[in-house]
Amino acid sequence: DKNQNTRITLILRNTYNGVHSNQISFPGGKKDKSDSNLKHTAIRETVEELGIDETLINLVGPLSQVYIPPSNFNVQPFVGIYNGTPFFNPDSKEVSLLIKPLLKDLLNIKSIKSEVFVQNKKIIVPSYIIEGHVVWGATAMIINEFITLFNDIINS
């Protein structure tokens, strides 16, 4: 927007017995049989997890698919714009916290290396620190692609 108040919405997943427990991610999940395509899945999952109005979401398009080895999933991210200021009512069963950095801040963020634990093993991964949270893995890759594409558009 003209006031540069556009935000990206990430979630901190709740703690549960699974490989993505307590991790930062974009809203999303598995394709249901009722989903006509992956675009529908992306919108449905976003609405379910964030509790926002589906009619105000405008999908811009897909980013590159990302494979996630620990869960053996191919993730198809989509970029969407919410037309208006969202009123969030996050699903407390899935979402512990909403993280909403300003787009203008995200565009200037630099990748760092962080230590994280995956299945009780310490690994060093490329990551971002966003509002005090370590963002790594598929989420960091999606953010990196988004930043690169957005900056290419702005600078062309």
Predicted region positions:
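Basic, gly/Ser/Thr/Pro-rich low-complexity segments located predominantly at protein N termini
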Residues: 23, 27, 33-34, 66, ...
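Buried hydrophobic packing segments
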Residues: 139-147
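N-terminal strand-loop-strand
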Residues: 1-26
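Unchanged
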Residues: 16, 31-130, 135, 148-156
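A broad "ordered helical/assembly scaffold" signature
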Residues: 1, 54, 67, 140-141
